């Protein structure tokens, strides 16, 4: 494998192990020419997929592009990297094992939305707003209404929790001041 630092062709594998979900082999490599160290991943690719865009244009499926689009939706969200990797691997595996050499970008978008909905509601809304090309606040309201009504009979939103506290009273008005969360200094 070519060294990404100096272009040398004689790199050596120093460590090799399966990834956490066993869907890839992680290899730690070193270049004897420059001493550079880097990591590669080896994954099974069942077939070469072609993505059919909305315009009709055909492009090769790019797993890294799928990863990047999910990463953008999940930016600054508390989701572990291994859960994101499992989502990306699951979508790629589902597409590759689907039996079709061509897959529409809409089908990929729907799989991503389905996966993000199970992973993180905020990321789901972020992705959906771009994927569905939201133009007005009403588009968000409709999506949030469907999201809040999911899983309830008739799609009704959850009723407010009776045990949930109301707005906190201001200090000195007979209520307690809201608790402050400790900040981590990372």
From Swiss-Prot:
Compositionally biased tracts (Basic and acidic residues): 12-24
UniProt-listed InterPro entries: ATP-cone_dom (IPR005144), NrdR-like_N (IPR055173), RNR_NrdR-like (IPR003796)
Origin: domain of life: Bacteria
Cofactor: Zn(2+)
GO molecular function: ATP binding; DNA binding; zinc ion binding
Signal peptide: none
All copies of domain ATP-cone, residue ranges: 49-139
GO biological-process terms attached to the record: negative regulation of DNA-templated transcription
Cofactor note: Binds 1 zinc ion.
Zinc fingers typed unnamed, residue spans: 3-34
UniProt keyword annotations, A-Z: ATP-binding, DNA-binding, Metal-binding, Nucleotide-binding, Repressor, Transcription, Transcription regulation, Zinc, Zinc-finger
Disordered: region residues: 1-24, 146-186
One family name in Pfam for this protein: Zn_ribbon_NrdR
Family in the record: Belongs to the NrdR family.
NCBIfam families from the UniProt entry: transcriptional regulator NrdR
PANTHER family found in the cross-reference section: TRANSCRIPTIONAL REPRESSOR NRDR
Biological function: Negatively regulates transcription of bacterial ribonucleotide reductase nrd genes and operons by binding to NrdR-boxes.
HAMAP family per UniProt: NrdR
Stated name of the protein: Transcriptional repressor NrdR
Organism: Methylobacterium sp. (strain 4-46)
